[in-house]
Amino acid sequence: MALLPILEFPDPRLRTKAVRVGVAEVVSSSFQTLLDDMFETMYAAPGIGLAATQVNVHQRFMVVDVSEEKNAPMVFINPEIVTREGDQVFQEGCLSVPGIHADVTRALSIVVRFLDRHGDEQQLTAEGLLAVCIQHEMDHLDGKLFIDYLSPLKRDMVRRKLEKQRRRAS
């Protein structure tokens, strides 16, 4: 297994729309290794979700584990939200936008259809943190970041803060 480099805002590759993954590819050993590498990268970061787009792989899949013990890994391949209900405001952060947190309104409950890591079709009802995480990671697959939900003024403040962090780091 290997740690993968995570793209950071404002890298334009984060804006790339991901393409669907073929079922034959899902079961390949190289794809399974990539999933394992993504989990290792997510846990090391540390994070609770990681979309393929964030590691410069522009295919529609993501890994998630919102458990406290980090023992409930979930893979979502070609995810689609079937239904959304209610609203919740959650303070979100992102491995691609380090050090920034902001309130984002998302659906309280979702039903998502997807392929699991074995290529089998699944359907899951998610609420709370899991629902937020799935919606956040699915946004990445569409080239969207959580900061896109902010006002232009707040987004500009985020950009300046990140530039300042990078200058300090170099």
From Swiss-Prot:
Do the record's keywords include Protease? no
Give one GO molecular function term: peptide deformylase activity
Needed cofactors, names only, are: Fe(2+)
Q: Which GO terms describe its biological process?
A: co-translational protein modification; translation
Q: How is the cofactor bound?
A: Binds 1 Fe(2+) ion.
Keywords from the UniProt entry: Hydrolase, Iron, Metal-binding, Protein biosynthesis
In the Enzyme Commission scheme, what number(s) does this protein have? Answer: 3.5.1.88
Q: Give residues annotated as binding Fe cation.
A: 94, 136, 140
Q: Which InterPro entries match?
A: Peptide_deformylase, Peptide_deformylase_sf
PANTHER family registered for this protein in UniProt: PEPTIDE DEFORMYLASE (PTHR10458:SF21)
Q: What is the recorded function of this protein according to its Swiss-Prot or TrEMBL entry?
A: Removes the formyl group from the N-terminal Met of newly synthesized proteins. Requires at least a dipeptide for an efficient rate of reaction. N-terminal L-methionine is a prerequisite for activity but the enzyme has broad specificity at other positions.
Its family remark reads: Belongs to the polypeptide deformylase family.
Stated name of the protein: Peptide deformylase
The gene designation is: def
